[in-house]
């Protein structure tokens, strides 16, 4: 098949953009699937790992898939930087049939299963391909058969076709933000991308998590303007930073009042996502409107 043989859809998913066909055999079934997005450095991996831990505390069988070349998504769950799917595929000259599950799936805190997809070298290849190959491997080894929750932790605020690949599998997208202009600006772009993809895929926006934020006034103002919603608030706690340094989740840290409150918030978030949320239909704002809403007093 050549590019000219592909059907080019029109409309909100990008004028002239090519939709990557998702083979029925590669669809994730039987589990609730969440994709976590947000501005680079906002704490997506910390949020994803603590959310995975919270789901596991609730008795759910959890798989977390890191989709960043840094491959540190599951660092606090496993206590180490685990080999990536792309690395182990290189070791077998890209013959996936030679791989065993223990080559690329690692057990972390409270039984959470951890996979790091990794990524191609800078300036080469496509991250979407790596995500696709990771899901194929998991399906081929039947590693998704007994999973209740899958969490994709996705690279930065990139919204190109490649790193939108997890949206093909996700039921809902969660955006991690902070109570500042740059984070909310990135969230606005992610909302636009997810809403566009939702016209072709099942994914829907769940809401946002205000992370590393003393207050939530700017986030709440944006949500009110765009019909979005805040799902949780994780304050800027030193214990969360220290947990990263200690290679641990928040659920393994000393139990002071702040830590217990943050754990309870993660449990509450996991419970609400598992239970299901009322649908919302948010809209992104033009750049000028974002500046007028948040950029000036």
UniProtKB/Swiss-Prot annotation:
Pfam families xrefs: Fer4_NifH (PF00142)
Chain ranges passing through the membrane: none
Manner of cofactor binding, per the entry note: Binds 1 [4Fe-4S] cluster per dimer.
EC number from the UniProt entry: 1.3.7.7
Catalytic activity line of the entry: chlorophyllide a + oxidized 2[4Fe-4S]-[ferredoxin] + 2 ADP + 2 phosphate = protochlorophyllide a + reduced 2[4Fe-4S]-[ferredoxin] + 2 ATP + 2 H2O
Gene3D superfamilies: P-loop containing nucleotide triphosphate hydrolases
Gene Ontology biological-process annotations: light-independent bacteriochlorophyll biosynthetic process; photosynthesis, dark reaction
Cofactor: [4Fe-4S] cluster
InterPro entries the record matches: NifH/chlL_CS (IPR030655), NifH/frxC (IPR000392), P-loop_NTPase (IPR027417), Protochlorophyllide_ATP-bd (IPR005971)
Physiological role: Component of the dark-operative protochlorophyllide reductase (DPOR) that uses Mg-ATP and reduced ferredoxin to reduce ring D of protochlorophyllide (Pchlide) to form chlorophyllide a (Chlide). This reaction is light-independent. The L component serves as a unique electron donor to the NB-component of the complex, and binds Mg-ATP.
Family indicated by similarity: Belongs to the NifH/BchL/ChlL family.
Protein name per its UniProtKB record: Light-independent protochlorophyllide reductase iron-sulfur ATP-binding protein
Organism field: Cereibacter sphaeroides (strain ATCC 17023 / DSM 158 / JCM 6121 / CCUG 31486 / LMG 2827 / NBRC 12203 / NCIMB 8253 / ATH 2.4.1.) (Rhodobacter sphaeroides)
Lineage, highest ranks first: Bacteria, Pseudomonadati, Pseudomonadota, Alphaproteobacteria, Rhodobacterales
Encoding gene, per UniProt annotation: bchL
């Amino acid at each position: 098949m050549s590019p000219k043989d592909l059907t080019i859809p029109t409309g909100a998913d990008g004028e002239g953009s090519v939709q990557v066909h998702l083979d029925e055999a590669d669809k994730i079934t039987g589990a609730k699937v969440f994709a976590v997005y947000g501005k680079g450095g906002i704490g997506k991996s910390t949020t994803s790992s603590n959310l995975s831990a919270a789901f596991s505390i609730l008795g759910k069988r959890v798989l977390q898939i890191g989709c960043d070349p840094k491959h540190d998504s599951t660092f606090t769950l496993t206590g180490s930087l685990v080999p990536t799917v792309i690395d182990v595929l290189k070791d077998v000259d890209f013959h996936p049939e030679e791989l065993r599950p223990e080559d690329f799936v690692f057990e972390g805190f409270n039984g959470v299963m951890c996979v790091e997809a990794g990524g191609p070298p800078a300036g080469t290849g496509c991250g979407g391909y790596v995500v696709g190959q990771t899901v194929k491997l998991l399906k081929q080894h039947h590693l998704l058969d007994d999973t209740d929750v899958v969490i994709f932790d996705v690279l930065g605020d990139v919204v190109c076709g490649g790193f939108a690949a997890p949206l093909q599998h996700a039921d809902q997208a969660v955006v991690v933000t902070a109570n500042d202009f740059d984070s909310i600006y990135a969230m606005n772009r992610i909302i636009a991308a997810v809403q566009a993809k939702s016209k072709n895929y099942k994914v829907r926006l769940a809401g946002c998590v205000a992370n590393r934020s003393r207050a939530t006034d700017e986030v709440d103002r944006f949500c009110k303007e765009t019909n979005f919603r805040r799902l949780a608030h994780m304050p800027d706690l030193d214990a969360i930073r220290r947990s990263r340094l200690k290679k641990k989740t928040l659920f393994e840290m000393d139990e002071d009042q702040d830590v217990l409150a943050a754990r309870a918030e993660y449990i509450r978030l996991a419970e609400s996502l598992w239970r299901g949320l009322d649908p919302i239909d948010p809209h992104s704002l033009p750049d000028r409107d974002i500046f007028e809403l948040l950029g000036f007093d």
